């Protein structure tokens, strides 16, 4: 394909190449991330690969334009400079998330990969850098599970079965009860399972991981559930999805970290009140997977839900005030 277009738009450190009115090109998520970065909000740096690229990808037998790789490499270098870490570096590794982002919301229809960039070497660097071996190996097992499912096509339940068996062997109920050594055992089991199913090993090269994830997100635009969703909601198939690559921020580093979702209004009633929920010591997929009961952000939300779990407003007041 000829080199003729700008396919990648960067954002972060108070600047962005995109804006909120570019959702047709950058997808809803990419456009809003760009807008928030421009406003100076603390958005982790990253870049969006455009919906036009998705269309070109399918128009040309799932082949990328010749100039895409160089644009991605430049954008990734910019993220490295902002974060002060390097993709694939054994001492100070940059880890990223790879997410879809259509111009309209299609919740749960397409694919996401977190903690990308971890391997047998960088996990040691993350453990040393964070001072938390358990967190590093927890992040690695999460990455292998998501990448194995989303990119490599190993059934999610293959990994869940191994996790549940390990918890049973250790007589634990919650994932958070498992130690660093437990996660190391599970990482080995996950990699062995991938080898058994595919006849090939889990990819250790971060660049290979990244392009695998980008391809999986573009591929998920045409998966059965996404296609059915678009048919049901009259969303054109030729709109395509963007891909958003962003530096990781970790909610699973301990009891003073969390992940969640937030709304400026109550999505059920439309009432103009801050609303949302969170999980302590978790990552995003834990919220949507329903494996733990989330806590409400506000006291009012906790009372509305008749929840006995304390709200963020009560247990993390400084973080709540920032939100």
Q: Which residue stretches match the model-derived regions?
A:
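Nucleotide/phosphate-binding sheet-loop regions of phosphoryl- and nucleotidyl-transfer enzymes
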Residues: 1-323
